[in-house]
Amino acid sequence: MRIEIWSDVVCPWCYIGKRRLERALGQFEHAADVEVTWRSFQLNPDTPPGTAVPTLDYLARRFGPQATAMTTQVAELARAEGLDFDFGAALTVNTLDAHRLLHLAADAGVGGAAKERLLRAHFTEGADLSDQDTLTRLLTEAGADEPRVRAVLASDEYADAVRADFDEARMLGANGVPFFVIDRTYGVSGAQSAETFLHALRTAYAAEDAAEDAGAR
C-alpha cells in the first residue's frame, strides 16, 4: 500500500496531519505494508527567493486581526499532537529549494527523516528554510550527503520533479494541503483525525484484498 502526501514544510496543518497519520499507522494492522511518499506543494510560490518574512507579520497582512486567534488555535491543536509550535519565531519563505532537497533525500532513502527535520526546524526552531547553509545543515542531520546537498543547491536539479508534483496535485484536484492519496484510489484532504485516517487505511486495504481475491479466481 502506498500513501502519497502533498504538503509544504511551512504548512502547520501539514505537520499536524503528519502526526495524526502516524497515530493511525500505529493502530493499523498492516502498517508494515505501507510505503509513504512525500510530494511537493508550495503555499507561497510567489515569495521572492531569499526573502524571509516573520510569519506573524505575513499572516497579519493576509488575515488582519483574525491572525492571532488563528495561530493560537493551531498551536493548541499542535500541542495535542505533541508539537510545540513557535509562530513568533517562524519565517515565511519560498520553499522551492527545500522541496528540491526533499526529492534528493527521497532518492537517498532518508526522505521521511528529512521531511520531519525541516518541519521541526521551521515550526519549533525558527529556521530560515530558504537559507542554503541552514538547509545543508538540516539535510545532513537527516542523513543526506553534504557534498551532494551542496551540489543540488548550486544547480536546478530536481526542479522539474517539484514542478511535476505541483502539476499532479492540480490534476488530482488538490487545491490545498495536506492532501493524502492512498493507492491512487482514496483521497483524504486536510489534517483529518487519526480515526478518519485509520478508517481510510482499512477501507483501502480491504478493497485491495478484494481485488486480489477476484483476480485470483
Each language-model region and where it sits:
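A broad, low-specificity signal for short, low-complexity segments enriched in glycine/proline
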Residues: M1, D46-P49, R61-P65, L138-A142, ...
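Short, well-ordered beta-strand elements
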Residues: M1-W6, E35-R39
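C-terminal cap of thioredoxin/glutaredoxin-like
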Residues: I3-W6, I16-H30, H103, D107-R217
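Short strand-loop junctions, especially beta-strand C-caps/beta-turns
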Residues: D8, G88-A90, T185
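Short cysteine clusters
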Residues: C11-C14
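Structural alpha/beta surface segment adjacent to cysteine/selenocysteine redox centers
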Residues: R19-H122, R217
